[in-house]
Amino acid sequence: MNMCTDGKKYHSTATSAAVGASAPGVPDARAIAAICEQLRRHVADLGVLYIKLHNYHWHIYGIEFKQVHELLEEYYVSVTEAFDTIAERLLQLGAQAPASMAEYLALSGIAEETEKEITIVSALARVKRDFEYLSTRFSQTQVLAAESGDAVTDGIITDILRTLGKAIWMLGATLKA
């Protein structure tokens, strides 16, 4: 058994005569611990963003309300999928996912939104900023996963980055008008 940085034990399929070494394609314990720590932060970021997107979905106002209301729903559905996938990856690695608002707020780099009357332009700009933050953070984790030989985490994050990249581009084009 090895330990993730959250103190939780996980079973490693790697066997090696050398301490700290792992089988080809299987990350070592230190790499797994670092990946787990990043994934825990991603779960927290996505948890906070999920609530934030609902706030915008419910409280935006402006001329394009219906279209943006539906777009925000698409975003929180997408965030839900990423949130669940990352949490399940943590479990596969033997770690526990944060699962409370207190944990999310303590770990997340995304700030809560408390404003209740939000213009469409303001909401979309804030969503774009949060997506850019996520893209940067996920890119860092992807490098760590790739360098560690964790192809599963690398693949999961590649899919998330693809979705984020398209959303950032589309939000940028929308806000340019």
Swiss-Prot record:
InterPro entries: DPS_DNA-bd, DPS_DNA-bd_CS, Ferritin-like, Ferritin-like_SF, Ferritin_DPS_dom
CDD domains assigned: DPS (cd01043)
Highest taxon of source: Bacteria
Example GO molecular function: oxidoreductase activity, acting on metal ions
Subunit structure: Homodecamer.
Family, as annotated: Belongs to the Dps family.
Protein name per the record: Antigen TyF1
Organism: Treponema pallidum subsp. pertenue
